[in-house]
Amino acid sequence: VNTATLPPRPGPARIALLGVLQILSWGGSFYLLGVLADPIAHDTGWSHQWVLGGASIGLLVASLLSPRVGRLIARVGGRKVIAAHGLIMAVGLAMMALAPNLAVYLLAWVVLGAAMATGLYDALFTSLGATYGMQARPIIVGVTLISGFCTTVIWPLLALMVHLLGWRGTCGAFAVLVLVALFPLYRLALPEHVNAPAHQRAEQGAGEPLAPSIYWVMTALFAIAAALMTCISIVLLTVLQARGHSLASAIALAALVGPAQVLCRVIDLALKRQAPLFTALLSSGMTAIGLLVVEFVPSLVAWGLVCYGAGNGLRAIVKSTLPLVVVRPADYAVVSGRMARPALLAQAVAPIACGYLISTLGSEAMIHMLAAMALLAFGLCLWLARLIAQRQALHGQAAV
């Protein structure tokens, strides 16, 4: 990236603002049902499967839209797209608040799926990567440091709102909040224009700029890592309780994951010029080691979860920066949008698959499968490292 053509990088205040806005973005969509699922089911009589299925529908819609969103960011810049995300989310939440039946509730999740596609990590980090190239890394890490506290902030807030307003009032109030906050503040925090090469590249409709083998291995790695994270967030408490832990003990153990995620991001930010490929190997390796410890060494389950949390904490950074090793910033938005589709689709299917596996094979089989997925992700990362090394040797590039 030619730094002379770049807009000024956001300072600490704008990075912190982006982190806070991401808390609202995630809290009004992906994490919404963590608090609202039970109140919605109890009030309406709709089954929990259908209530929770709304989130899967939203993720499915996001997966279908992500390549188009990537092309749109390449063409018009992330500022307009991500600011519009606030308007779309407000519409979806308002529809949910007013939903007279299950069909309208599920339609609201279709709209929220469009909001997720245009404003969560994939869209934001795609915009930053396309604009700043590798210089986006400290911005991305800084945003994840703040947004990593999303559930810590949002779930108690949503619980209080449900207590005071009911679930419909909570959706309505949150719709107003994101409408007045996200649209104007994203426009304030993000640069106004994409750089010219990215704009020209999008207009010319350039094809896939990297080797198919690297593209597909990287895409598979991101999809498996996303599915793994989603599965663990769903089944961790169930697996721990099946192994003899009380609910209170299981919650305490699961709570170790969040601080470990944030701590590893602080360390990554302090180390500054960490090579993305090294970070990817570290992330997938620590995730695999952590889950193997959870699987085979029950007495060290706490350390296993800390190790898993540290590896998973680097995942968002890896997903945003690793493609820049092999993709020019001008092509980054389009490629990143394409890569996001399988990962989002895996996240949409994960809750259904987890429920089926636990009900048919049991929690022990579930933890075996999760450890196997983590090992597969690490193997793909090693394969990717070899492919990138071969590519760099062929083109005489420096190692990453």
Spans of features found by a protein language model:
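Conserved MFS/SLC helix-loop-helix module at the cytosolic interface between two early adjacent transmembrane helices
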Residues: 64-102
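Extracytoplasmic gate region of multi-pass secondary transporters
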Residues: 33-37, 211-263, 268
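C-terminal transmembrane helical hairpin of 12-TM major facilitator-type secondary transporters
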Residues: 257, 261, 274-322
